């Protein structure tokens, strides 16, 4: 993760007033967690920020309040200064928003952890790591924004789900370093981990009765 790229993205975030954040179709915990963490940080800093995804939030991921803020269409009457895509390796993964993103006249930022990312934005921060939620906290801090408990929980969701509860081979020392910082900011790793990996549906539980 280069300091120059972080500084450039921080400059873009701080110099704009209205930001659109997009994630990939059929969203997972990392896509939603990273996007909503950034949106929440921007809102806390007095910006207007919107999170958009072609598909609705899956029921199993509706464990954090911010999930209610995800839009499946562009907000009417809003003129964006900056567009940011998260956890999206190529433009087609933005689904119905791909054409809007491609034609946007202002700056676009692409933040992702997939090695296959094709650098489709004007500014691309692509780091090979376990999750985009391993990158987003660094972006937020570089912009001088605070990581609150709400933000930490959202980033924790992405770290947990994309790392398989820290069981995948791409988990590194830095993954745990970021996790420790999020825990220090109040992230409920035990609670989120339970919801994602241990809680059983009623129907599944009945199989053992």
What do the PLM-derived regions correspond to, one by one?
Residues 2-25, 33-62, 72, 76-80, ...:
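Hydrophobic helix-and-loop "lid/oligomerization" segment in the mid-to-C-terminal part
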Residues 22, 26, 85, 110-111, ...:
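Generic enzyme active-site microenvironment
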